[in-house]
Amino acid sequence: MAGKTLYDKLWDMHEVKRRDDGSSLIYIDRQILHEVTSPQVRGAAPGRANVARGCQHRHPGPQRADHPGSPVGGRRHRRRNLAHPGADPGRELRRVRHRRVQDERPAPGHRPCGRPGAGRHLPGMTVVCGDSHTSTHWCGALAHGIGTSEVEHVLATQCLVAKKMKNMQVRVEGELPLGVSAKDIVLAVIGRIGTAGGTGHALEFAGSAIRGLSMEGRMTLCNMAIEAGARVGMVAVDEKTIDYVKGRPYAPQGADWDKAVAQWRELVSDADAGFDTVVELKAEEIRPQVTWGTSPEMVLPVDERVPDPASESDPVKRDSIVRALKYMGLAANQPIGEIKVDRVFIGSCTNSRIEDLRAAAEVAKGARSPRASSRRWWCRAPGWSRSRRRRRGWTGSSSRPVSSGATGCSMCLAMNPDRLESGEHCASTSNRNFEGRQGAGGRTHLVSPAMAAAAAVAGRFVDVRQLLQA
C-alpha cells in the first residue's frame, strides 16, 4: 500500500463522510471569526436575512478585528478610523456570540501571529477562517480560508463540505546564503511556478533548507502558498515544531502532552508517499528577491534587471509586462537596484513576527547617515502585542522616522488610513502587490524584512548581503 502525504493523513483524520458527488464532510477543530467575512452570519450586512440557527458546539470561537484600523495611534484612534464610518466590526462580531459561541481570552496579537504563538492551534488540527491567509495557522495543521456561507455552515454543524485537493511538494535542499530568508524562498518559488502553479493543490514545503527554518519562517512559507495558487500551505512536524508548542498557554500538559507528542510525530509524509507535482530548488541558488510588477510572480533577484517586453515571445505575457511597467513607472532593462523607495512597510500576517522585526533592526542598526531621509516613512505593524514583544526581548529599532503601534493589517491593504499616495514606491513585507493594493496608484514591491530595512537605509533597493557583510 502506497504511503500517505501529510495532507492525506490530516484529511483522513477529519473525514466524517464521503459523499456520492466526490466531496467529503470534514470535521473542523477550530474556526476563527473576523470583522470582514463573519458578521454577515447574523444578518449584519444589508440585504441578508437574520439567521436564527444555533451553533453545534460551544467550542472556543475566537473573534478578531484586524483589517480596518490603523495600528498607529492606539485603540481610540483605530475606532475613529474604521473603514466604514459609524460601524463597529467588533460589535458585530460580539453579536455572533449570541449564537452560543464561547469566546476566548484575546490572543496576544493579530490572528495569524498571536494564535499559533499561544498554542491555540496545534499540529493535527483543522482550522478555518473567512480569510485566504488562514494557511499561516500553521505547521502540521490543515488550515485554509473559507467563504461567508461556509462560516455559517461550520458554526451550525462543526463540519465543512469540501473536495480533496491534489498533493504538491516544494523541496528546497541545501543551506540558505547570508541575507536570504523564508520570504525569499517563497517568492522564488512563485517566480518559478507562477501564481497559478499551485491551483487545486495542498502545498507541502520540505527539504533540508525548510527544516533549517525557524517556526516563524515556516509560517511565512505557509502564508504565501496562497500567492502560489494553493489553498493550503504546510510543513511537516519535527522536533522544532514540538519545542515551539511546549509550554504555550493552551498547549497540552502532563500525560496529555506525552500522548499528543506521540501523535504529532506521525504527521509527516511517508517516504514512499506520492505527490502529483514536485518542484525542487537549491537553497544556495536563491538570492534576495524583489517584485518589480503587479503580481507576486513578477519577481527577480535584486541584482538583476526589470524584463524587456520585447524579449517575450508570448503576446499575452508581453502585454502583461507592458502594463505592469507602465503602472509601476519602470523602464525595460532598468536595474532593480535603481528603483527608488518612498515608503517602507514591515508588517502583515506574512512578516510581522519578532524574528522579522529583529532581522530588519539588525540591518538598520546604526544607520543614521544622510541617506536615511525623513521622506521615507517606516510603518511597523507587529503581529504580536507590545507586552509580548517586551517579554521576548524586543526593544525596537533606533532608526527614524518610524511609526509603530498596535497589531493589525495596516498598510498590507488599503482599507484603513495606512496607505500609499499615488505614484509612491513601497518596499513591503506583505504578500500581495496588485494594482492599488496599498492605495490607489500605489506601487508595491514585495521583499523580506531585511531587504525592506536595507531599502529604508539606502532610499532604493540594495542587496542586503552587502550591508550584512560590511
Curated annotation (Swiss-Prot):
Coiled coil: none annotated. It catalyses: (2R,3S)-3-isopropylmalate = (2S)-2-isopropylmalate. InterPro entries: 3-IsopropMal_deHydase_lsu (IPR004430), Acnase/IPM_dHydase_lsu_aba_1/3 (IPR015931), Acoase/IPM_deHydtase_lsu_aba (IPR001030), Aconitase_4Fe-4S_BS (IPR018136), Aconitase_4Fe-4S_dom (IPR036008), IPM_dehydratase_rel_enz (IPR050067). SUPFAM superfamilies: Aconitase iron-sulfur domain (SSF53732). Its EC number is 4.2.1.33. Pathway: Amino-acid biosynthesis; L-leucine biosynthesis; L-leucine from 3-methyl-2-oxobutanoate: step 2/4. [4Fe-4S] cluster binds at C349, C409, C412. Binds 1 [4Fe-4S] cluster per subunit. One of its GO terms (molecular function) is 4 iron, 4 sulfur cluster binding. Its cofactor is [4Fe-4S] cluster. GO terms for biological process: L-leucine biosynthetic process. Residues 50-121 are annotated as: Disordered. Keywords: 4Fe-4S, Amino-acid biosynthesis, Branched-chain amino acid biosynthesis, Iron, Iron-sulfur, Leucine biosynthesis, Lyase, Metal-binding. It is an enzyme of class 4 (lyase). Catalyzes the isomerization between 2-isopropylmalate and 3-isopropylmalate, via the formation of 2-isopropylmaleate. Belongs to the aconitase/IPM isomerase family. LeuC type 1 subfamily. Heterodimer of LeuC and LeuD. This is 3-isopropylmalate dehydratase large subunit. It comes from Azotobacter vinelandii. The gene is leuC.
